[in-house]
Amino acid sequence: MESQQLHQNPHSLHGSAYASVTSKEVSSNQDPLAVSASNLPEFDRDSTKVNSQQETTPGTSAVPENHHHVSPQPASVPPPQNGQYQQHGMMTPNKAMASNWAHYQQPSMMTCSHYQTSPAYYQPDPHYPLPQYIPPLSTSSPDPIDSQDQHSEVPQAKTKVRNNVLPPHTLTSEENFYTWVKFYIRFLKNSNLGDIIPNDQGEIKRQMTYEEHAYIYNTFQAFAPFHLLPTWVKQILEINYADILTVLCKSVSKMQTNNQELKDWIALANLEYDGSTSADTFEITVSTIIQRLKENNINVSDRLACQLILKGLSGDFKYLRNQYRTKTNMKLSQLFAEIQLIYDENKIMNLNKPSQYKQHSEYKNVSRTSPNTTNTKVTTRNYHRTNSSKPRAAKAHNIATSSKFSRVNNDHINESTVSSQYLSDDNELSLRPATERI
């Protein structure tokens, strides 16, 4: 009878035997993993089912599933949301363990030994969509490291949660990366994260928390697909795929370089020279602008540079426009040499003009200086005084006496006229009346 029952229902016998054996082993060994499946969390139960269905061996395939025993298998890890980052080889497991970040995992799965991440940022469900545009948390961290750094120079997170932040647009091409970075930085500032973004010198006002780091990584990965990033950004992320702040810092520096290129072009197009400064200074200024553009892979030909310089010449240098108007092979060095020649000629002429004026003024001073005086600064207008020159009082006295004497002379003239008439009657002679010499 027993043999017939064994042939009729062999699976039930093996199942009961397996159950009895496992139950004895559990009771004897007191395996901590031998707990009831009903006591496991829901997500552990799901992960166990997935692993039990995928990983089956020939020895256990014929044995029915035992709900009283759970084998110690690792939990399944969900793949990252953005597959492009994984396909391009982000970070090896050894580097990930060394940097204390999980390998290819979502920010919610990143390991942090001293920090308990708040469940408000992520859910334990692996199918939970990331990122959720939740503002970075600013709660105080129970991390003892944070308590030690309370008096450090870089303060910790003290921001407030800011809701309803408009997310940035998605990057569409590699050429628009710098424009996208501007919007992404504005998005972080609107999320109260402006104080953890490095400035132009690479300095930050405070250290970011774990949640803020995860939030930045999460949003950057969501809105900037890996295959649309520039090559230098990919190189940084291949070394450390979570180092987003370095990418932002270098992006800002490169944007400033682009702004400098624009400023150099504007300065080169608006060149002006009239000889007020030295020709050497003008040449150094123009050469520096051209060299800076060349370092940024922008070559300025000699013909273009000469045309821009000639356009801004004025004064004595303006005639060079007509000289170079018909030239096809313009050399920048030759143009600088001719500008230097004109500048030197004008300088010599300006030096000679003051010397001639100085000699002329000295001649005038000598002609107006008295030869008897020792002080050359004391000049007299008429240093050759004639003997007939008299003071004003003497002149006034002479005028008064001359007027008085004129009346006497008039009387005498009248008398002499009468006498002359008498003589003319007698002798027919006319004599000149006698006058006194003054």
Swiss-Prot record:
GO terms for cellular component: cytoplasm. Residues 295-397 are annotated as: RNA-binding. Its main location: cytoplasm. InterPro entries: TYA (IPR015820). Capsid protein (CA) is the structural component of the virus-like particle (VLP), forming the shell that encapsulates the retrotransposons dimeric RNA genome. The particles are assembled from trimer-clustered units and there are holes in the capsid shells that allow for the diffusion of macromolecules. CA also has nucleocapsid-like chaperone activity, promoting primer tRNA(i)-Met annealing to the multipartite primer-binding site (PBS), dimerization of Ty2 RNA and initiation of reverse transcription. GO terms for biological process: viral translational frameshifting. Homotrimer. Pfam families: TYA (PF01021). This is Transposon Ty2-B Gag polyprotein. It comes from Saccharomyces cerevisiae (strain ATCC 204508 / S288c) (Baker's yeast). It is found in: Cytoplasm. Residues 369-381 have a biased composition (Low complexity). The record marks 397-398 as: Cleavage. Residues 1-88, 364-397, 419-438 are annotated as: Disordered. Residues 1-11, 19-39, 49-60 have a biased composition (Polar residues). The C-terminal RNA-binding region of CA is sufficient for all its nucleocapsid-like chaperone activities.
